């Protein structure tokens, strides 16, 4: 196939992550993302290398016989969901098959192990407790939009007023915010021009308590930046801004006094909403970073407080706008219950006199789950804010046998005097650094648990562990993200006798 060629084919299978294998009528194999087994699709070839072709999806010519589920009206346009048109059981089959194939390839005949059936999320819809919506426009110089990125686009935004993976409170807050800033004619931050005010809307809602935090993330751009320039340069900038305002009705700049009025008005709009949950805090965060990420460069509380509480497996957690916390609270209970069952098995006292390392511990959720049944837990996490949150939450739950250390696992392991009896691994998507994995293996613990959000990384690290004297006892997937391509996997390993 040639780059730029347009063709059609049938999707035979989907490999992780989101790689549809399409066979053309001429028998050629092409990888096309965002497809579902059984579909017939048209695509444009955008990459050919060493005989392997990749294509960009143009159109679903014929739906798959499996696609029988209702979808939100943004499905296919929004980049959030891929499998929403499939019944949930079909989604689970695809994810389990993908992971099983990777694990089988990694392990081969090195050991006998048990692959348990995938565990589903308690909720398939309205399961997310956090959303980061982006401001932008759906097309160049179009009306202000607030929502998710269009599939395959870094710039275009789809207003997702019908989003199904969040509940009605998220949608109400999103639409009220969008209507308010459209009315005020405020411009969004343009990533290429590096101008504008509105960046993101962060909404968090606790599933168990119903408490809500809303945080508006903006730049600090205003007329003050213009006044600091030399007269000639200032005149040019002012002229450009005025021209932009003429082209774009919502391109208003924001000075300090106007910002106070603007934020006060937005706060009042939110407080007037009739929500199922309880609004605990309305916040404003400043972020002048060039990167298109939610970053905290200073947060102001406009109403209430900057935290709320969520409950997980009988534990209580204080969560701020930027705390790391699993985005599916009920699914997290399934994930951590699975890990605890793998660890304890039929012996609830097996850790009673043991020290556990929780490596890549985040805010210490797993550590606190194990603390009541072991002698001591040592958590290691590179993000200092997460470590502080872990300490605060452990105190909140009256767990005094937890120690949390900030730093890179590779370096921090050299500073811990007490050796582990058991190790829990929950690394980021890219898995464990090879040198850190060597140090972990050298402890020689009898058992380890590996929790992975990216099965390709898990498969790679399992190959190293198998080569260094460990065997895999059992593996189980947990679906934390219904309607998407993502899946968590838990693996239990033991030292070869």
Language-model segments: residues:
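Extended interfacial segments that mediate partner engagement and assembly in macromolecular machines
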Residues: 61-70, 79-188, 208
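Structural signature of eukaryotic scaffold interfaces centered on beta-propeller domains
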Residues: 204-206
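Terminal RNA-binding accessory module
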Residues: 1-74, 151, 403, 411
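Flexible loop/N-cap segments at domain edges
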Residues: 201
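Short, conserved phosphate/pyrophosphate- and ester-handling motifs at nucleotide-, phospho-/glycolipid
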Residues: 38, 166, 328
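Rossmann-like S-adenosyl-L-methionine
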Residues: 2-8, 14-17, 219-497
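Short, acidic/hydrophobic/Gly-rich beta-strand patch recurrent on exposed beta strands
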Residues: 20-25, 147-150, 215-217, 390
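Nucleotide donor/acceptor-binding cores
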Residues: 129, 210-212, 353-354
